[in-house]
Regions:
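Short loop/turn motifs that connect adjacent beta-strands in outer-membrane beta-barrel proteins
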Residues: 37, 168-171, 184, 200-201, ...
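N-terminal periplasmic accessory domains that precede
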Residues: 77-83, 104-107, 155-176, 191
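Extracytoplasmic beta-strand/coil segments of soluble accessory domains associated
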Residues: 78-121
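Short acidic/polar hinge/loop motifs at secondary-structure boundaries
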Residues: 123-147
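Surface-exposed, low-complexity loop segments enriched in small/polar and acidic residues
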Residues: 214-216, 220-231, 259-294, 300, ...
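C-terminal beta-signal and terminal closure region of outer-membrane beta-barrel proteins
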Residues: 403-405, 409-411, 583, 600-601, ...
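C-terminal beta-signal and adjacent terminal beta-strands/loops
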Residues: 411, 686, 781-784, 835-844, ...
Length: 917
């Protein structure tokens, strides 16, 4: 017969002390507790389908309970996950204004969100967005720091984050929290309610939550209010070369204004002069968010009912709606807008190509109406011999309906720059010609005429059927114990559809893909897992277990994949566990990797021709090629962004990986209640899916005699992106940028990362309460990346530079990340302090006398205090209480810092009230 589910003794011991290696707690269980555990049901822990009465395994797992989440003081699970030391590199979230689309992601080992599998109760959900998981409904979070493709299939290369939701909840729990940044902005709030009831036959729980986050502007923080660059060891204000009164060059061959520019019409004198970066650049920070706003509402439920002896039906459901937006600088006429010679405001009477920031539009606003739905139904039970089984069907769907405001209609802006064409168009005639050589010259009517909203809709669906059987050999086991095993099958269907806006379909929205993307695939999987006790109860071996698993995966568009995993657990004495694992892994290409159409994108790159005449490291071949392109020896660019072409590749294959962990867990008898765990890890990925590195392609081309390298074929030049070219150059546009570099996802990259995870916990009864100490951390010894064969191998450990998994944005790969927690609590109150540390990082492009060669080490201090009164809990706290500001990073176009790696908002103070009945 089923009873209302309760966690095993081992799990309760583990989660009671929060984030420490779960296996660490098993060694400290007393003999009496071990005896009690025999009567506790078997449970499934992340990383294995074999159900156990404890949570020992060869794989390192960290467990966080609901109390850990509450002590962090965070309103959303995103911030909590990002603070876990095993996370590294770039992660989308509230700090990401450019490119996040409002979503929040996880990044174990710094290997990218696509290689970190996020689960809810051991099952996939369609979006992978952390915003879809409400704090109020989380019972615990299990983080598997090991490859797990054998257990969970594709994507679990770096590890797994498994959110276990509340199921057996009785009563009512209400929570309300309000946060305010130390600068008086960025208000965030959360209200949640969870209600549950149970009987002898079953239970039901429902949870509702609403979370709100308000804006913080870049202009409201000193470090981000103005873009800076370095010159001669000093910081100078800078910005974009496309400013509010236009930078331009003549398209007439031989004109004095065709070279040596760009040029501007001086806003004060009206005279034509050369562009001066120090005074003429555009400050895009004034129209950009630092912390992005959002509103998230969610409703989740779970229910189970015993329909027969040892047979239970269960149901899980969840719905989340997120309203989010990002704001960035106004569009600019980067497409090569031409002001004709007969335009009345043309200062030189020649056709000129102008880059003009459309500041009158107020900026580009990217808004998302995102809905995430999941429903799981199934049955589970026990056979007479104690074996357990379950079958389930999981349906998950997300819809992302976006609305971008402030996009430029290229056709209409071009009309307003050409008197002849404008006269032939009734709409243009009504608003009149536009003077792009003067700031604030666009009238509201012209803005309305020239702007076009973009409203694409993306939809993804995951359907998953699972059947599992697990048990042990009982009395027919080995002398050391019964052999545990699990086996199962899975069928999964994935589909994705992206429908662009009608304006994009006809090519009128600048920078927006104009073709729909649609694709689907399905797969069949089967797995088997075994845990064999080799030795037990001997003087030299308290326990020696061997585990193995194998999984077969058959996609309808790939060859069959076989992955394997092996593990060993050895306890020479009760207080010491030595463990090791070896696992294969793989990641299948996504539908967008396979089928997305080509689209234009602005991508940062390193131009090899910058000041090539005085560049001592430039070869004679490179200098000759730069000169052949018509570039002066002192060639400079306002900023380095290439108009590139990106799209899918139906021939891309799966990534393959191997991962290894070796470690130990020690609970010394001479220090009561102390547990220490250290694990070494190493992950290698071959054939990683990536696009050719833009900088590497351009460098390889210019380093070859007479542009003979095969890389040159990947540079389409200005014709590929429909913009005027630079006179005498086949690769550069009218401003001098290398453009039209094409790239499609291919299996060309390699990754190798290694390091150590360590956890320690200790508690002591002191006075009328208990003192708790916990330390968890990760030390990164290696993170090497090669973008493609022949490219330089980059070692990012302890450095900051471009993250290959984060859209070409700069992030920090700190060698050491730790969280130290001190807490003391009684029946009436508790207090806690969390110190979050990350070590210094060095600039990958360090140079003598450069201001930002190194960031320095960082420590954030979080404090909290709670008072308990009857059924109420009152909490006050602060995150980053000393208002530690992020480090300055030069020439980084996003906030002058590494916004994905550091706290950008500053100090946050909060209050929370919760009630339980």
């Amino acid at each position: 017969m089923f009873t209302n589910t309760k966690l095993s003794k081992a799990v309760r011991l583990a989660v009671a002390f929060g984030a420490a290696s779960t296996a660490a707690f098993t060694g400290s269980v007393s003999a009496q507790e071990a005896e009690e555990a025999k009567d506790v049901e078997r449970i499934e822990v992340t990383g294995s389908r074999i159900k156990r009465t404890d949570i020992e395994s060869a794989s390192p797992i960290t467990v966080f309970n609901a109390e850990d989440l509450a002590k962090s003081g965070h309103v959303t699970i995103e911030k909590f996950v990002h603070s876990i030391p095993a996370m590294n590199g770039g992660m989308n979230g509230s700090n990401t204004n450019n490119g996040s689309g409002g979503a929040a992601s996880a990044n174990l080992r710094g290997l990218g969100a696509a290689r970190t599998l996020v689960l809810i109760n051991g099952r996939r959900y369609a979006s992978g967005d952390l915003n879809s998981i409400p704090m109020a409904f989380i019972e615990r979070v299990e983080v598997l720091r090991d490859g797990a493709s054998t257990i969970y299939g594709s994507d679990a290369i770096a590890g797994v984050i498994n959110f276990i939701t509340k199921k057996n909840f009785e009563g009512v729990e209400l929570t309300a929290q309000y946060d305010l940044a130390g600068e008086g902005d960025g208000e965030t709030s959360r209200v949640g309610a969870t209600i549950g009831t149970s009987s002898d036959k079953g239970n039901v729980v429902i949870s509702l939550e609403y979370a709100n986050r308000n804006t913080i502007w870049q202009k409201d923080r000193d470090f981000s209010k103005q873009p800076f660059a370095e010159s001669g060891g000093a910081l100078i204000p800078t910005g974009s070369g496309a400013n509010a009164f236009g930078t331009w060059v003549s398209t007439v061959p031989g004109s004095q204004y065709a070279t040596g520019g760009p040029y501007v019409v001086d806003p004060t004198t009206g005279a034509v002069r050369k562009y001066a970066p120090a005074t003429d650049s555009y400050n895009y920070a004034t129209a950009s968010y630092l912390v992005t706003p959002q509103d998230v509402f969610s409703i989740n439920s779970a229910a189970s009912y015993e329909i027969a002896d040892d047979v239970k039906a269960f149901l899980e459901g969840g719905y989340t709606n997120r309203q989010s937006d990002q704001l960035m600088a106004a569009d600019a006429t980067f497409w090569g807008a031409t002001v004709t010679a007969d335009h009345p405001n043309n200062p030189i009477g020649e056709d000129v190509v102008i880059s003009r920031r459309l500041t009158e539009t107020g900026g580009r606003s990217f808004n998302q109406d995102f809905s995430d739905f999941r429903m799981v139904t199934g049955f589970e039970g026990f056979l007479e011999n104690g074996w357990s089984w379950d079958v389930s069907y999981n349906y998950a769907r997300y819809t992302d309906a976006s609305l971008d405001i402030g996009r430029a209609n290229t056709k209409r802006y071009n009309l307003m720059l050409d008197p002849t064409a404008c006269a032939e168009d009734a709409g243009c005639t009504a608003v009149g010609l536009w003077n792009p050589f003067q700031a604030d010259s666009l009238t509201p009517q012209q803005v309305a005429f020239g702007s076009i909203p973009n409203s694409p809709v993306d939809t993804g669906v995951t359907k998953q059927f699972m059947a599992n059987l697990t048990g042990d050999t009982g009395d027919f086991g080995l002398e050391a114990g019964s052999i545990g095993w699990a086996t199962g099958v899975e069928k999964r269907w994935e589909s994705y559809r992206s429908i662009p806006d009608g304006g994009a379909l006809i090519g009128e929205i600048y920078g927006v893909v104009g073709e729909p993307t649609e694709g689907a695939y399905d797969l069949d999987e089967a797995y088997a897992e075994i845990n064999v006790p080799i030795l037990a109860g001997l003087s030299y071996a308290e326990r020696l277990d061997f585990s193995a698993a194998v999984r077969s995966t058959n996609y309808n568009f790939l060859q069959s994949q076989i992955t394997k995993k092996f593990g060993v657990e050895y306890s020479p004495v009760t207080s010491l566990l030595v463990r090791a694992t070896y696992a294969d892994g793989f990641r299948a290409p996504s539908i967008t990797d396979l089928y997305s159409p080509q689209a234009e994108s602005n991508t940062p790159y390193v131009d090899p021709c910058l000041e090539y005449a005085t560049n001592g490291s430039a070869s004679a071949t490179l200098k000759a090629n730069c000169a052949a392109e018509g570039l002066p020896g002192n060639f400079l660019l306002p900023n380095n962004q290439s108009a590139t072409l990106e799209g899918g590749n139906p021939n891309v294959g799966p990534e393959e990986s191997t991962s290894t962990t070796v470690g130990f867990v020690y609970t010394p008898e001479f220090v009561e209640n102390l547990t220490v765990a250290i694990d070494y890890y190493k992950v290698e990925i071959d054939g990683a899916i990536g696009v050719p590195n833009i900088s590497a392609v351009i460098q390889s081309c210019y380093d070859s005699p007479n542009f003979s390298s095969a890389s040159c074929a990947l540079i389409g030049g200005p014709g590929a992106v429909d913009r005027p070219g630079l006179q005498g150059s086949k690769f550069r546009d009218f401003q001098g940028y290398v453009v039209g570099v094409t790239g499609a996802p291919s299996n060309i990259a390699t990754f190798e990362t290694a390091g150590y995870d360590f956890d320690a916990s200790w508690y002591k009864d002191l006075g009328t309460g208990r003192l708790n100490v916990r330390l968890d951390g990760t030390y990164l010894t290696e993170y090497s990346y090669q973008s493609q064969e022949g490219a330089d191998v980059l070692d990012l450990a302890g450095k900051y530079g471009i993250d290959p998994n984060f859209g070409g944005r700069a992030v920090a790969f700190s060698k050491l990340r730790t969280n130290l927690t001190l807490g003391y609590g009684t029946d009436d109150w508790n207090v806690s302090w969390i110190g979050r540390f990350q070590s210094n990082v060095e600039n990958m492009q360090a140079a003598p006398n450069k201001v930002s060669n190194e960031t320095g080490a960082y420590v954030y201090h979080d404090v909290q205090g709670s008072y308990f009164y009857d059924n109420l809990t009152f909490t006050l706290g602060a995150r980053n209480v000393f208002d530690k500001q992020p480090p300055y990073v030069s020439n980084n176009n996003d906030m002058n810092t590494l916004n994905s790696s550091y706290d950008t908002a500053g100090a946050y103070f909060y209050g929370r009230v919760s009630a339980k009945f």
